[in-house]
Amino acid sequence: MEKVLVFGHKNPDTDAICSAIAYAELKKELGMNAEPVRLGEISGETQFALDYFKVEGPRFVETVANEVDNVILVDHNERQQSANDIESVRVLEVIDHHRIANFETSDPIYYRCEPVGCTATILNKMYKENGVTIRKEVAGLMLSAIISDSLLFKSPTCTEQDVAAARELAEIAGVDADKYGLEMLKAGADLSGKTMEQLISLDAKEFQMGNAKVEIAQVNAVDTNDVLVHQAELEKVISAVVEEKGLDLFLFVVTDILTNDSVGLAIGKAANIVEKAYNVSLENNTATLKGVVSRKKQIVPVLTEAFQA
């Protein structure tokens, strides 16, 4: 049986990794030869979850057409966020919870996108719909994905469906969602030992906003100053990325997991759009974004609207 690769976006977060594992397992149970893979490094937060539930991380691939003809995308759909050679393979399915942009296919496909906080929430439904029992370890990873994407249920993207799914999965996994979740988020917020290049690419996504090319990277911290003390070095590596990719804006967002506020570091010729979008003034290229924790709901649509205004 021909193999199908299942993967999330480049610079994968916990949902991208864990949902690839969970969906590949469901597809295998349903008779498909599916393998989860990843398009980037595993973050400290994700590694904590993998270690906790004793699951091996997916192998890394840069290209997919050299291995398979067919792929399944989870937690993304935009071409620039996917495998470098995504145009050379057939996308069989997409399971996602983001905006749909820069995506088209030559054939009809199974496309499931729901306005929930996490791909794993959708997968929880799909396991039930197919009558497949979720293994304890996989339930733990799916729970981890929901906790990560919802910032332990505090993000505005978090829905009642996400909370209900997390409670169900926590029971299967045999953990206390709140206690485990805080441990996992703290592990992810430990940025010691990371280079500046790693910091700005840990969870970075590229977007087309009108005619502008924008990259938004986000890291969680217990104290934003722990990251911003390195601002000069960060600006140097961000400026290099802006030049290399021809970006109009690179927004580096440091989110405080305790206060649920963020600080944005804006570099690029369109940095003023951040001021316009949030009605703030950049001082030394930074501004506090009160109550902003979600890239998907509080940053991407707000900046997109500002660019198009």
Curated annotation (Swiss-Prot):
It holds the Pfam family DHHA2. Its cofactor is Mn(2+). Its EC number is 3.6.1.1. This is Probable manganese-dependent inorganic pyrophosphatase. The gene is ppaC. SMART domains: DHHA2. Keywords: Cytoplasm, Hydrolase, Manganese, Metal-binding. It comes from the Bacteria. GO terms for molecular function: inorganic diphosphate phosphatase activity; manganese ion binding. Mn(2+) 2 binds at D15, D75, H97, D149. The lineage of its organism: Bacteria, Bacillati, Bacillota, Bacilli, Bacillales. InterPro entries: DDH_dom (IPR001667), DHH_sf (IPR038763), DHHA2 (IPR004097), DHHA2_dom_sf (IPR038222), Mn-dep_inorganic_PyrPase (IPR022934). HAMAP family: PPase_C. Binds 2 manganese ions per subunit. It catalyses: diphosphate + H2O = 2 phosphate + H(+).
